[in-house]
Regions:
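Periplasmic-binding protein-like
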Residues: 29-30, 107-114, 188-228, 247-254
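Short helices/loops that flank or line small-molecule/ion binding pockets
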Residues: 57-58, 66-67, 71-83, 98-100, ...
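Ligand-binding cleft/hinge of the Venus flytrap
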Residues: 35-40, 52-61, 140-159, 165, ...
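Extracytoplasmic small-molecule ligand-binding "clamshell" domains
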Residues: 22-88, 97, 236, 249
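A conserved helix-loop-strand patch within extracytoplasmic ligand-binding domains
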Residues: 61-64, 90, 103-152
């Protein structure tokens, strides 16, 4: 595995693969800014990378970040290839049948994005005959299937967030469903300048109460330590200090 140090300030908690780590943290191998991405120097950077490092430091553990394809990340956890998922995974009842979750560490709404000129408002009728893009194995896919599938031409799945944004920009699909915050990079780019958020999408039964760390059900001690670490970095200001570098609002949510 290639070296994936985040930044020099994080090396006390995140290590490269040639060092034996106490905890292996899995996240999506595809870029997902501002949460995680690889910079020009080959370093893994982003808000969630820094939060993961802070949690490891709070637990007094050395952690290795292991990039995993999103649709294989829960199987990797169950197969003990990783020990925890700190990768923007929503806490849902369906996933909790298979794995356990820590307390939430952030919560942002989902959104429907389409061309500024498109007459789409987030209602099922407004996507009639449209092709909707979603990342596979996500709550966004579940929402699109529940609310839009009966009216849309089709729901097209993609392996990662960037792929459906590229197809949207090229006109191969009409709209995409994803995390509202993750769309910011696309919407402020040249490729995304003609697109906008058409609607915020809410359904707690689908999206859950927020994002938590995914843990194997039997690892109850590790789960308790993650919960304690989340509470600690929230209380001591570390969480806010990291968040202020990326956001001008409270990402923790309600």
């Amino acid at each position: 595995m290639k070296k994936i140090l985040s930044t020099l300030t994080l090396t006390t908690a995140l290590v490269s693969a040639n060092v034996i780590a106490d905890i292996r943290i899995g996240l999506d191998s595809a870029p997902y800014p501002p949460f995680s991405e690889t910079n020009a120097s080959g370093e893994l950077v982003g808000w969630e990378v820094e939060i993961g490092a802070a949690l490891c430091e709070a637990m007094g553990e050395t952690c290795e970040v292991v990039p995993v394809a999103w649709d294989g990340i829960i199987p990797a956890l169950l197969a003990k290839k990783i020990d925890a998922i700190v990768g923007s995974m929503s806490i849902t009842e369906e996933r909790m049948k298979t794995i356990a979750f820590s307390d939430k560490y952030y919560n942002t709404p989902a959104a429907l994005v389409a061309a500024k000129s498109a007459d789409i408002d987030g209602s099922p009728d407004s996507v009639k005959g449209k092709i909707i893009g979603v990342q596979v194995s996500t709550t966004h896919q579940n929402y699109a299937q529940a609310y839009f599938e009966s009216m849309a031409d089709s729901i097209k799945t993609y392996q990662n967030f960037d792929e459906h944004n590229q197809d949207l920009a090229s006109g191969r699909i009409d709209a995409v469903v994803g995390d509202s915050l993750a769309f910011e990079g696309f919407l402020t780019s040249d490729a995304g300048k003609d697109f906008e958020i058409k609607a915020s999408l809410n359904d707690e039964a689908i999206f859950g109460p927020g994002v938590g760390a995914g843990i194997r059900k039997e690892d109850t001690e590790l789960l308790a330590r993650f919960n304690a670490a989340i509470a600690q970095i929230r209380a001591d200001g570390t969480y806010q200090k990291i968040s202020d570098k990326y956001f001008d609002f409270d990402i923790y949510g309600d």
